[in-house]
A protein has these predicted regions:
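Conserved short S/T/G-enriched processing/targeting/catalytic segments and their helical context
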Residues: 1-64, 87-126, 140, 159-206
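Short beta-strand scaffold segments in enzyme catalytic cores
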Residues: 66-73, 79-80, 124, 144-153, ...
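Short arginine-rich
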Residues: 133-140
């Protein structure tokens, strides 16, 4: 959701209708906010109020589970949050859903969890496409189309075009196969250095 210099991206896991309800209320909560602090507080308050409201309807122990990851950018500043139920925490990296273990592993391996410096926006999009591809390939229950949103502080925010996501995914599938072969080749001490270098060069050329 975008409005001038204010943008919100939100995804969720768990009880679908409840996630949709919070998502539909998130943008309304941001109306009239002036800065990132007001925006952050507004969405957090909305989440807590929604849980309080529906908590009076559901029987004890039957309340639907939902996890949210959302980002906000306004006035040249941005923040990322993760909400586990009504508990909201600010994050530099977050994952959720049944594929989050695989996502965390791949993000750490590719330096995308913020612990070893920061990636460029293009690199983050590539990592996101790769994680989604791997999750859909290897985690039961993960599927559907891949959707990637980018929030920018100095430029326009929005969704990455579906065609680009598909192109990235196909390219990463090919690169992933060759990367696996290279890992095996580097452990093959019978292969000469020149042969290994040639294999690496041909793979990079792809």
């Amino acid at each position: 959701m975008i409005n001038h210099d204010l943008a919100l991206a939100l995804c969720g896991a768990g009880h679908g209708p409840f996630v949709d309800k919070i998502a539909s209320r998130a943008w309304d909560a941001l109306r009239g906010v002036a800065d990132i602090v007001e925006a952050s507080n507004a969405v957090e308050s909305m989440i807590k109020e929604t849980y309080q409201e529906f908590g009076q309807i559901y029987q004890p122990g039957s309340f639907p589970e939902a996890e949210l990851i959302y980002g906000i950018t306004i006035g040249g500043q941005s923040k990322l949050f993760q909400a586990c139920g009504p508990i909201v925490l600010e994050k530099s990296y977050a994952s959720s859903g049944i594929g989050h273990y695989l996502a965390d592993f791949l993000a750490e391996r590719m330096g995308a969890n913020g612990e070893h410096g920061w990636l460029t926006t293009r690199q983050c999009v590539a990592v996101a496409a790769y994680i989604l591809f791997q999750a859909k390939e290897h985690v039961e229950g993960c599927g559907g189309n891949s959707h990637i949103a980018v929030l920018r502080e100095a430029e326009s925010s929005g969704m990455v075009e579906h065609e680009l996501v598909e192109h990235l995914t196909e390219h990463l599938k090919l690169a992933d196969r060759f990367t696996g072969e290279l890992l095996l080749d580097t452990a093959d001490f019978s292969m000469s250095d020149s042969a290994l270098a040639e294999k690496i060069e041909s793979s990079v050329g792809l």
